[in-house]
């Protein structure tokens, strides 16, 4: 795999300390992410991007903000330049107060050079449609969100959300149904939450895992990054690359 680590690091990444080896040369996270080979013939390539503490907590104080750092946010932004669609569950949209997807000029240019649209499209999954039409995520009419829901979704909420988003009823909202709806995509990035990602893991619809390990121990009863039915058999992943931040560790896993 091409690391894309040669040459000067662009100004927007100079605050980050992401390196190929501890104390080694800085790499450009965007170049690295755009260089990885991705794609499969039968369905979109699915990436999960998550941060966890050393002791496995994926949610602290209701979200992941407490365990992020600057390097993680830099890598998060680089990974967001990759997909056609960003898929996220409604609970995470509420907990993290999602905003409309936007990318800086450099990431937009990298996407256009790769044959992608300037900005990935945000897709929110919810069976209950328990979302506030006035939420920040719906604040940019030029970045209209798609909401995927099931046949039993409440009609009143469907009508209200249709004013600010494209709401689509599916026969079911299993990972297979979601990927079938998004079948024209090459890459889908799942940003959670743990329940949504757990369903993808259990269904075997995982191709890549971008995992940030934050140097914290929190104990408590926090859920893991994948929560729900067990994968049977467990999904075997291969460690493809390790990068080092000033504090955090970045692991890229792919299916063998």
Regions found by a protein language model. Name each.
Residues 9-256:
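Enzymes that bind and transform nitrogen-containing heteroaromatic metabolites
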């Amino acid at each position: 795999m091409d690391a894309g680590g040669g040459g000067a690091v662009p100004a927007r990444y100079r605050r980050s300390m992401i390196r190929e080896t501890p104390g080694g040369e800085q790499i450009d996270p965007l170049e690295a992410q755009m260089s990885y080979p991705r794609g499969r013939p039968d369905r979109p390539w699915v990436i999960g991007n998550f941060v966890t503490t050393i002791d496995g907590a994926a949610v602290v104080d209701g979200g992941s903000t407490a365990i992020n750092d600057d390097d993680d946010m830099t890598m998060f932004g680089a990974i967001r330049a990759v997909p056609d669609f960003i898929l996220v569950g409604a609970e995470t949209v509420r907990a993290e107060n999602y905003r409309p997807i936007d990318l800086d000029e450099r990431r937009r240019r990298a996407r256009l050079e790769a044959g992608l649209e300037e900005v990935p499209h945000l897709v929110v999954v919810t069976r209950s449609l328990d979302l506030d039409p006035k939420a920040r995520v719906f604040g940019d009419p030029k970045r209209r969100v798609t909401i995927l829901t099931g046949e039993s979704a409440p009609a009143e909420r469907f009508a209200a959300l249709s004013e600010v988003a494209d709401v689509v009823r599916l026969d079911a909202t299993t990972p297979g149904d979601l990927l079938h709806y998004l079948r024209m995509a090459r890459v889908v990035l799942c940003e959670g939450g743990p329940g949504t990602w757990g369903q993808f893991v259990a269904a075997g619809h995982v191709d890549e895992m971008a995992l940030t390990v934050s140097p914290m121990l929190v104990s408590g009863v926090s859920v893991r990054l994948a929560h729900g039915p067990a994968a049977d058999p467990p999904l075997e992943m291969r460690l493809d690359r390790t990068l080092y931040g000033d504090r955090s560790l970045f692991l890229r896993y792919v299916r063998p």
